[in-house]
């Protein structure tokens, strides 16, 4: 079934298995309750080219705990059983997909309730076969678009499925105090060519940034800031008597990011 989403979109990112698989399920439930429209579930990888230090540390913790691509996909199935209903996008690098087998990957993802796939190290120009395979299984391949040439932006935006993930600046993920001055022009150019909602990520970490972007995009992806919060709460999240309170604190933080998005878009 096609991924159908409507702005404004609050799209949080967490890493599967950080700090433990059962905690990831609780965090996903908390994010949905806090207003998430889509969940990006990151699959830990040993050589994450697009990820900054915060997400690299989270990936290392999850890998140390035994998380793999098949286990991450199965974790989505567990989330569905526990009541997570929002769309879930599987964020994975290409090599684990290749090792599992492309068709097996899509079949397992569909079987466990995934709604789409994002592969950050797969160039758009080489994504055609995987995009077609995803269409066969009803799982759109979400495109990343960075501030590059207008011709390339047009090609990527016009072929986008589900929603379009705009990278706010070149480089790796991570919390940023400020966003590039040219971001607005870039997002306007993307929206000119896109038939699907346009979300922006890489560095979005504060309500003020969310409010700033309301006129030029349809949603925001927040990753490093939330993963950093998980890192801070990890000892309590792994302590049975403290987990409920820690999850509630995480949810409150997520809500503080989602609420300004709703307010900003309601005033458009």
UniProtKB/Swiss-Prot annotation:
Keywords: Amino-acid biosynthesis, Aromatic amino acid biosynthesis, Lyase, Tryptophan biosynthesis
The enzyme's E.C. designation: 4.2.1.20
GO molecular function: tryptophan synthase activity
Pfam family, one: Trp_syntA
Enzyme class, UniProt record, top EC level: lyase
Alphabetized Gene3D superfamilies for the sequence: Aldolase class I
Active site residues of this protein: 40, 51
Reaction equation(s) it catalyzes: (1S,2R)-1-C-(indol-3-yl)glycerol 3-phosphate + L-serine = D-glyceraldehyde 3-phosphate + L-tryptophan + H2O
Pathway membership, UniProt: Amino-acid biosynthesis; L-tryptophan biosynthesis; L-tryptophan from chorismate: step 5/5
Residues spanning the membrane: none
InterPro entries (alphabetical): Aldolase_TIM (IPR013785), RibuloseP-bd_barrel (IPR011060), Trp_synthase_alpha_AS (IPR018204), Trp_synthase_suA (IPR002028)
GO cellular component, one term: cytosol
NCBIfam families xref list: trpA
Assembly and interaction partners: Tetramer of two alpha and two beta chains.
Family: Belongs to the TrpA family.
Main function: The alpha subunit is responsible for the aldol cleavage of indoleglycerol phosphate to indole and glyceraldehyde 3-phosphate.
Protein name: Tryptophan synthase alpha chain
């Amino acid at each position: 079934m096609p991924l159908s989403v409507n702005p404004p979109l609050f799209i949080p990112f967490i890493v599967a298995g950080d700090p433990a698989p059962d905690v990831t399920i609780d965090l996903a439930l908390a994010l949905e309750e806090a207003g998430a429209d889509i969940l990006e579930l990151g699959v830990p990888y040993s050589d994450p080219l697009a990820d900054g230090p915060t997400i690299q540390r989270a990936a290392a913790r999850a890998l140390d705990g035994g998380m793999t691509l098949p286990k991450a996909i199965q974790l989505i199935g567990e989330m569905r059983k526990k009541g997570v209903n929002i769309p879930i996008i599987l964020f994975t690098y290409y090599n684990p997909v290749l090792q599992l087998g492309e068709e097996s990957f899509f079949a397992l993802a569909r079987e466990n309730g995934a709604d789409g796939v994002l592969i950050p190290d797969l160039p758009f120009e080489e994504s055609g076969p995987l995009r077609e395979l995803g269409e066969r299984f009803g799982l759109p391949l979400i495109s990343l678009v960075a501030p590059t040439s207008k011709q390339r932006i047009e090609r990527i935006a016009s072929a986008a499925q589900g929603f379009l993930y705009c990278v706010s600046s070149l480089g790796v993920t991570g919390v940023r105090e400020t966003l590039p001055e040219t971001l607005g022009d870039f997002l306007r150019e993307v929206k000119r060519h896109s038939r699907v909602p346009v979300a922006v990520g890489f560095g979005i970490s504060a309500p003020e940034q969310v409010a700033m972007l309301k006129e030029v995009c349809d949603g925001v992806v927040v990753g490093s800031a939330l993963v950093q919060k998980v890192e801070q709460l990890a000892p309590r999240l792994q302590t049975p008597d403290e987990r409920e309170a820690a999850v509630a604190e995480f949810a409150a933080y997520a809500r503080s990011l989602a609420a300004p998005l709703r307010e900003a878009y309601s005033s458009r």
